[in-house]
């Protein structure tokens, strides 16, 4: 088969981009490195242009390679989805469900839920991925896999082609460790942050908070020094080590620490506006019984959890 028409060769190409290594891509796809190298050379020969700049074992995408990657990933995703639909019986409670979640909530909340669901339906298999882009783009992983279900936040804009199940409101808590507050004092107003270190979270699915509200008032945030991290786990680790103040820690990630007072709320009610939390599914995926049953089940489970948080921390829902 012509390499241009061979999707397995294109999948090898995307795997090399993802792993940044021909050998790692070969291992992932169970291909001999020599064969993988030959397939890649054949593909470039048929294209008439290089996909990679080769420097020893290092491979860097050419500008054409970047363009090819962006165009082929959706094609491979559609191919994978078509195969799954052809293989699967929509009415049966068996088969795979591919799930994507916000970084950080998987180990604490989602993994236990998947295990619980598999006890009820042992023929269901799960793949859990980390959300790397806002929805709906986030349904497709960097490897080109299309996910069935996503758990995350939603603004007011509707998502076309997406089924949504509301779970609850997520408050964001400005907080710091007692260790930090004992050394640096307690900020009571956003203006006080000029004397403090801000631990700021910036990721593919959220930007760093630069403004807080309190009732009808709002105020910009400015810090003496900043520590920027790219996921909630790193932010929480820095927070507990006394590195500074997180102005927007989701209550989900700090409720236990607030209970045992290893984290203390600051800024006297100033906060980032809360966000609505949802379980999402692509309409095509939701048409499968296993996906619809799972989505409705986990959405109800998440709602119970959010209701418990609201009852225990009513002060953050005013």
Model segments located where?
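C-terminal effector-binding regulatory domain of bacterial HTH transcription factors
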Residues: 1-3, 70, 123, 251-260, ...
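Residues within the DNA-recognition helix of helix-turn-helix
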Residues: 32, 39-42, 113
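A short LG(V/I)-centered, amphipathic sequence patch enriched
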Residues: 44-63
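Central regulatory/effector-binding core of bacterial HTH transcription factors
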Residues: 95-159
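Acidic, Gly/Pro-rich loop/turn segments at junctions of secondary structure
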Residues: 130-207, 211-228
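Hydrophobic hinge/microswitch elements
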Residues: 219-265, 272
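Short helix-loop hinge/linker segments at domain boundaries
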Residues: 56-59, 66, 77-100
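Short helix-boundary/capping micro-motifs
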Residues: 14-30
């Amino acid at each position: 088969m012509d390499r241009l028409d061979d999707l397995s060769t294109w999948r090898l190409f995307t795997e090399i981009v993802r792993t940044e290594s021909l050998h790692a891509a070969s291992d992932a796809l169970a291909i001999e490195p020599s064969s993988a190298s030959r397939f890649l050379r054949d593909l470039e020969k048929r294209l008439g242009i290089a996909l990679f700049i080769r420097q020893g074992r290092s491979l860097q995408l050419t500008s054409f390679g970047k363009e090819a990657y962006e165009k082929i990933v959706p094609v491979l995703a559609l191919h994978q989805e078509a195969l799954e639909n052809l293989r699967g019986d929509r009415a049966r409670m068996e088969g795979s469900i591919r799930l994507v979640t916000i970084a950080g909530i998987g180990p604490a909340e989602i993994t236990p839920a998947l295990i619980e669901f598999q006890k009820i339906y042992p023929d269901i298999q799960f793949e859990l991925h980390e959300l790397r882009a806002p929805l709906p783009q986030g349904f497709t992983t960097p490897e080109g896999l299309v996910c069935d279900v996503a758990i995350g936040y939603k603004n007011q804009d509707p998502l076309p082609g997406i089924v949504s199940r509301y779970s609850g409101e997520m408050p964001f808590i400005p907080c710091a460790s007692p260790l930090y507050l004992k050394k640096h004092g307690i900020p009571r107003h956003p203006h006080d942050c000029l004397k403090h270190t801000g631990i700021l979270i910036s990721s593919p699915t959220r930007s760093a908070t630069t403004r807080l509200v309190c009732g009808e008032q709002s105020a910009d945030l400015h810090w003496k020094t900043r520590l920027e991290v790219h996921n909630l786990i790193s932010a929480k680790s820095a927070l507990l080590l006394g590195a500074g103040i997180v102005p927007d820690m989701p209550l989900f990630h700090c409720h236990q620490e607030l209970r045992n007072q290893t984290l203390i709320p600051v800024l006297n009610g100033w906060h980032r506006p809360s966000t609505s939390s949802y379980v999402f599914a692509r309409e095509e995926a939701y048409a499968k019984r296993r996906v619809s049953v799972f989505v409705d089940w986990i959405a109800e489970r998440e709602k119970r959890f959010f209701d418990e948080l609201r009852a225990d921390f009513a002060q953050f829902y005013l």
